[in-house]
Amino acid sequence: MLGITDLTAGLNSLQFEAGVEHKHESLLPLVGRSHILMLNACAHCIYFCRLLLSCRQKEAGTGNPFAAHRIPLASRCERLRVSIIGGGNLGKQIAHCLIDLGVIRAEDIRISTRRPETLQDLQELGVHCAYDNAALATWSQVIFLCCLPSQLPSICTEIRDHLKKACIVYSLVSGVPLSRLKQLLSHSSIIRPDYKYEAKDGALVHGKKRTITANLKDLSVVKSTSIGIFQKEGICVLNRFIETSMYAALNMCSLQGLSSKEALTLLNALIPQTQPLDLASSLLTPEAFVSSEFISSLSDESPFPWFDLCTVQSKETPFSEYLARSLWLRTGLEELYLAAFKTP
């Protein structure tokens, strides 16, 4: 459970809108906009962690709702160590969503915040809460940055020398572009979803009265957060989040000691086949991810090269071109996204 109950639910006179003066009513849509942005951010964090975790599973039957595969992994490790820097509303919501939807175990989540005493509900669930950004960076495989923009430079200074090459920094800090993050961290495994909001009729009412976690247990709401497509809420991720997630998954496969052939077998097993298409034309191949010039040097036994996630978000890639012309893949990834929200 989220641990926080809205005692004012159903009491109109105690709702936020009731205390707003008429001259400020035009600003009320900003509240709904904030809710929708947070809903989408949490949903995409869940999908991303599910995808990475699926690349760390030893075999079927481990509680992962994604389609099962049985490729033995070198490290034989199923855990994904996730950290959150920033104990404000967004950081807390991400932690609760990861736990309540069964994505990450509480003991595999750490939060660094200046006031860990305010996170008692998460600590009671088993989340380690402290104020030590450097130690958190050393421990983590994924770090969600949920701090204020003004705090970012000092935080980056604290963590950049402690980041492992494979650690993915996932930034939800507004107003700080990817190029600036790369400069501050001297790191290439960075993801920064770039959200565009387009107000539409009825967009601000949907799911607003429920918690983020409750919304993400509702399939109709989950569908509204689908990546890369304008839905009725008017949210779109602009910077190739789908492509970046897949390249991050390939990096995780390489970290696990999988060859390129094994990595593709894993991803093909994850992506649902939703239509009766020719099997050969509906499978990922090396050409979907690397250039034709590199194919000749890539054997089935060798791993994929290590992909720079910053470059993937800023330039056209073989996968972005392949995705654009492959209806089966877009449909399959949509189904894979929805599968991330099915609790074990």
Swiss-Prot record:
EC number, UniProt record: 1.-.-.-
One Pfam family named in its UniProt record: F420_oxidored
One annotated GO molecular function: oxidoreductase activity
Keywords, ordered alphabetically: Oxidoreductase
Statement: the UniProt record of this protein carries the keyword Cytoplasm: no
InterPro entries for the chain: NAD(P)-bd_dom_sf, P5C_Rdtase_cat_N
Function of the protein: Probable oxidoreductase.
Family: Belongs to the pyrroline-5-carboxylate reductase family.
Protein name: NADP-dependent oxidoreductase domain-containing protein 1
Organism from which the protein derives: Xenopus tropicalis (Western clawed frog)
Gene for this chain: noxred1
